[in-house]
Amino acid sequence: MKKIEEIADFGPLPSAAQLAYHRDELAAFIHFGINTFYEQEWGNGQEDPKCFNPTKLDTDQWIRVLKETGFKRVIVVVKHHDGFVLYPSRYTDYTVAASPWRDGEGDLLAEISRSASQYDMDLGLYLSPWDAHSPLYHVDTQKAYNEYYQQQLEEILSNPLYGNKGKFVEIWMDGARGEGAQKLTYEFEAWFETIRRYQKDAVIFSTEATELRWIGNESGRAGDPLWQKIRPEKLSEQTPPVYLCHGDPEGTYYSVGEADVSLRSGWFYHDSQQPKSLADLLDIYLASVGRGTPLLLNVPPTKEGLLAEVDVQRLQEFHQVISSLYDEDLAAEAEVTSSSERADYPASNLTDGQRDSFWAPNAEETSYVLEIDLGRSCTFNLLEIREPIAKGQRVAGFILEVKKEDGWTVFARGQTIGYKRLLLGEMVEARYLRLILTDFQALPLLSKLGVYRTPAIMEEEKRPSGLVLSQAASTVIGGQSSQISLRRLDGLEQAEQIRLVTEPGTGTHGTAYEDQIWNVTFAPGETRKELTLSTLAFTGQQELNFYLCASREDGRQSRIKIKVKGS
């Protein structure tokens, strides 16, 4: 038997767990707790546990819906910054045991674990390091607090009743810490050791150099370019969001940037909020999964303990469109030729439908060209490229062209590819495509090239909002207010109420802004309204941003980015 030539690895490589998360693509966040009943985002630790009483709690519904709509893992918030715990912990009385829910005998973590085990849904744990309730959360008692946090980790991770059949795939350590909170030094290494002792296969999300990093914003959008590697010495609570968003082309540690965003404006459920539009979700998908990184979408349950019907419907619509994107790969089994290829790694591997096969060139050159013949003229507007990321991320520049009657025309160009790159362009008709690799850190390898036509609903969702949001000043100093103008361009013959809400970006609730909601009523013929948007002061020279979203009664939306500078 002929021995297949082995291609050398390059740079930091993903672990089996990181590679599995790349392949999962979609994860769900569940924010549910005492904040849900106070309709707030961040509690102060003084909320009354007796307010926690979800009368129709159904974790089977949560997991079933998420499973049916394409999510592969669920990260459940067991303790948020307020310190309220969703299981009866031995180390604090600020738990569900102090609530009227289940007559004080309930254990929400056990319930969602049973549901996850029943539906075989991977489960992750969010346990906030910042705890506004604990009297130990003070620099003078930080050793005792670190032990307290570690005890809770052990209590959860060692319990076979918790997790999907006792297993957690991800541990989430949020780096958020409110203005004025004590600046404790966390004993991360001791915590990490505890996690690996009980859940050795779990990936860890933290501000340190762990398997997962924050993507640098809460809008669910990865940077472009996006490198799934960093330099460990550059990671801390003070790491600039832009570094996290793009990664580091010279990175020495493989780090998956997790793109998190909420289905609604807030992380916890509020009656006054609505789910994002389908168009928004599709845009977020293309800017996260479409840039090679997992999307972590928060779906907050109601006070009753159910996923809201309107949210379920939006998830179903989202799943239907995403699934239909890949219904027909026009490049399946298409003929591919290349300027260079190795016998064991031919260009035909790009369209053979096999996950683990890939193309490799035969010689080191300054650029490489691959040409795809679809066999017939096809209409398409979405292209997919993949690298075999298990061998290391390599490509740093590419151009995609289509051949028209007058010659080759650029369809898209970019820098990084990574696990998966989706490139959405204008609808074109062509038989031949050409991929030119212009820059790479090592011998480039590619595992897939797909060609698709997006479903018609994606075009329908692009309808203009008929709203214009503008800001008096392009940038605001934190702590100052910004004057916002809202103009209505259509539907002027009718009265209309437009809702405006704040949404996170690189700046989050409690750092750059406090959540604000306006219900603005336009009279018939009225076209313009003015409002004042407040921001929060923060120290440092960095610039943060968040969004103001305006929603019409027919579901159309418009957004403006608010830039805030520190002082």
Predicted features by range, described:
Residues T366-S367, G375-L382, A430, L492:
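Extended extracellular/luminal ectodomain segments enriched in beta-structured repeat modules
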Residues Y368-L370, N381, Q480-I484:
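Structural beta-strand segments of beta-rich domains
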Residues G375-S377, P388-A390, F440, L489-E493, ...:
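Short solvent-exposed strand-capping/beta-turn motif centered on an Asx-Ser/Thr pair
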Residues W408-T409, R559:
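Tryptophan-centered short beta-strand motifs
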Residues L424-M427, T535-A537:
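Short, flexible loop/turn segments at beta-strand junctions in immunoglobulin-like
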